[in-house]
Amino acid sequence: MSGERAKRFPLALEDLKREPRKPEGRVAERQAAGDAARQRLTAAAAVPAAASPIVPERRAPHGGVFAAKPARAKQHAPAAPGAAKRAPQGGAKQGDRSAAPNVALSGALALTSERVRERMVERLRANGVADPRVLAAMSAVPRHMFVDPGLAAQAYEDAALPIGHQQTISKPSVVARMIELAAAGRALERVLEIGTGCGYQAAVLSRVARDVYSIERVKPLYERAKLNLRPLRVPNIRLHYGDGRVGLPAAAPFDAIVIAAAGLDVPRALLEQLAIGGRLVAPVGEQAGEQVLTLVERVAPAQWRESRLDRVFFVPLKSGVI
């Protein structure tokens, strides 16, 4: 074969003679292809039965399978309303799911706080507190926010609780009684509190009077009261660090003065800062002896009337600051 012919016909004679052997390979390939086709047909025949349950899943975004997750979240919602609001943001993140119990616990504590405050108010009403303003104020102010976390469970019991520095938060019944005596059904403009403590009584007073001035002689308690009152955003309380026995002559006269510590007598400076017709409520007596809740009314520029009422027990009224 010439070179030119080889270029036009690259197959040699030997190649043409071997060609008849290849049909066997093609038959085998066709047989293999047929087997594969039959297997695909067999698999295809089985697919509809296995795939049929998957069809609803493709429609799930419109309320199918994925609706189960919101449904489970709604089952938990009554116990923790706050947690239910946060559930859509949780997704599949582990951190969000682990935070949910804390949110639920906080919501439960808030609800419990409201319920126990209402029960506390019912006890106050049963014990003779009748002024609706005082009852509403006692119901509104969260006492557990003014005590140590370890004592929060006892916050709505009728008990005095320690707040540090040898001081206490007064019993709810005593707080309500003193404020009711000071108000006597009147509209209070200016009220002076001696002994801020943790700030609880000042918060209650702020819902009964237009302006509340409160003095604390213990600097750490003064700072603590500011921190306790800050979340409540009470606009009409003015806290002062100073000697409560001196009062606040610059802000006088006061319609009412409430003293949250017991002295052997009522300081003369405080009597002078009481407005005509004003009322002062204070425990009077010795620390180791009998203390009596005393009401003093200023009936004239140089005349006061005193009434001795209930037996009580308070921390001592001291002068100076620390």
Swiss-Prot record:
Assigned GO CC terms: cytoplasm
Keyword S-adenosyl-L-methionine: yes
Active site as annotated: 170
Keywords: Cytoplasm, Methyltransferase, S-adenosyl-L-methionine, Transferase
Cysteine pairings via disulfide bonds: none
Ranges of biased composition (kind: Low complexity): 33-51, 76-91
Ranges of compositional bias, category Basic and acidic residues: 14-29
Broadest EC class assigned to this enzyme: transferase
Gene3D superfamilies: Vaccinia Virus protein VP39
Function summary: Catalyzes the methyl esterification of L-isoaspartyl residues in peptides and proteins that result from spontaneous decomposition of normal L-aspartyl and L-asparaginyl residues. It plays a role in the repair and/or degradation of damaged proteins.
Family assignment from sequence similarity: Belongs to the methyltransferase superfamily. L-isoaspartyl/D-aspartyl protein methyltransferase family.
Name of this chain's protein: Protein-L-isoaspartate O-methyltransferase
Lineage: Bacteria, Pseudomonadati, Pseudomonadota, Betaproteobacteria, Burkholderiales
